[in-house]
UniProtKB/Swiss-Prot annotation:
Naturally occurring in which organism (per UniProt): Homo sapiens (Human)
Subunit structure: Interacts with ARL3.
Protein's name according to its UniProt entry: Cilia- and flagella-associated protein 36
Cited function: May act as an effector for ARL3.
Residues the record lists as Phosphoserine modifications: S85, S147, S201
Record key words, sorted: Cell projection, Cilium, Coiled coil, Cytoplasm, Flagellum, Nucleus, Phosphoprotein
Length: 342
């Protein structure tokens, strides 16, 4: 007898579960829930509208169940026994019987309607996103928007900081290259100045080396024969050989009229020697003065040239460029602080 009752309860449960999974039940219930779930939210307070909708739902469930139970011959007691049986307590059975239980329990009904409302919203958002490729601003969460804006600002800040650092590094590299270029240009200038001084010194030496020869030739061409006739040979022979040395003529070959110098008197030779010595000293002084003037001229000419090169290679920054550079550095420092603080 108990086995027959269990079999009967099992049959009733399976029969009801089959009906609840069928279109005769699922289509009208689903249509009602989708149409009425729009007003439901997850607030704790229950509105009057919720109660009215729940009453409508309860009437719909009773109508559908009564029609089915009459059709298969199940009375109300059998139905209640099947719903309270252990077979109806399983997880699968509870999921199937939830729409029926919601008709009797408002809490279950409200939770079901809120869940359906959320599912409908998510489905609508998914359809819009699939059609347009992006969601409108009105459907995005405020916190997500702020997060995206902050993320975009961080990207911009990092990019500005990177560009500022690159510009600063380029400026430093340009200054370093200018310093190296100036060092290279100054070194050849110094060498060229020294070479020019040496060349001028050699030129001065050659220039002043000629006058003694000219003096020698001029002195050699002078007619000294009349003087030789007035001087006695005995006096000439007794003159020391060292007194015959004339500046600029020590290494000159004695030939032609110059050989007649031996007949000159001692006093005359000394006068000649003194005269030539004065000339030599004067020429040496002139040579020294000219060399000094040339060095001074080269220094004076080299100084403006260096200044021009320095001005050309080192153009001073304008006030606007200085202000721009200062702003960049301040912005870089501010961005670094903000990035570090964040």
């Amino acid at each position: 007898m108990a086995a027959e009752e269990e079999d009967e309860v099992e049959w009733v449960v399976e029969s009801i579960a089959g009906f609840l999974r069928g279109p005769d039940w699922s289509i009208p219930i689903l249509d009602f829930v989708e149409q009425k779930c729009e007003v439901f939210d997850d607030e704790e307070e229950s509105k009057l509208t919720y109660t009215e909708i729940h009453q409508e739902y309860k009437e719909l469930v009773e109508k559908l169940l009564e029609g089915y139970l009459k059709e298969i011959g199940i009375n109300e007691d059998q139905f209640q026994e099947a719903c309270t049986s252990p077979l109806a307590k399983t997880h699968t059975s509870q999921a199937i019987l939830q729409p029926v239980l919601a008709a009797e329990d408002f809490t279950i009904f409200k939770a079901m309607m809120v869940q359906k409302n959320i599912e409908m919203q998510l489905q609508a958002i998914r359809i819009i996103q699939e059609r347009n490729g992006v969601l409108p601003d009105c459907l995005t969460d405020g916190s997500d928007v702020v997060s995206d804006l902050e993320h975009e600002e961080m990207k911009i800040l990092r990019e500005v900081l990177r560009k500022s650092k690159e510009e600063y590094d380029q400026e430093e590299e340009r200054k370093r290259k200018k310093q190296l270029s100036e060092a290279k240009t100054e070194e050849p200038t110094v060498h060229s100045s020294e070479a020019a001084i040496m060349n001028n010194s050699q030129g001065d030496g050659e220039h002043f080396a000629h006058p003694p020869s000219e003096v020698k030739m001029h002195f050699a061409n002078q007619s000294i024969e009349p003087l030789g006739r007035k001087v006695e040979r005995s006096e000439t022979s007794s003159l020391p050989q060292k007194d015959l040395k004339i500046p600029g003529l020590e290494h000159a070959s004695i030939e032609g009229p110059i050989a007649n110098l031996s007949v000159l008197g001692t006093e005359e030779l000394r006068q000649r020697e003194h005269y030539l010595k004065q000339k030599r000293d004067k020429l040496m002084s002139m040579r020294k003065d000219m060399r000094t003037k040339q060095i001074q001229n080269m220094e004076q000419k080299g100084k403006p040239t260096g200044e021009v090169e320095e001005m050309t290679e080192k153009p001073e920054m304008t006030a606007e460029e200085k202000q721009t550079l200062l702003k960049r550095r301040l912005l870089a420092e501010k961005l670094k602080e903000e990035v570090i603080n964040k």
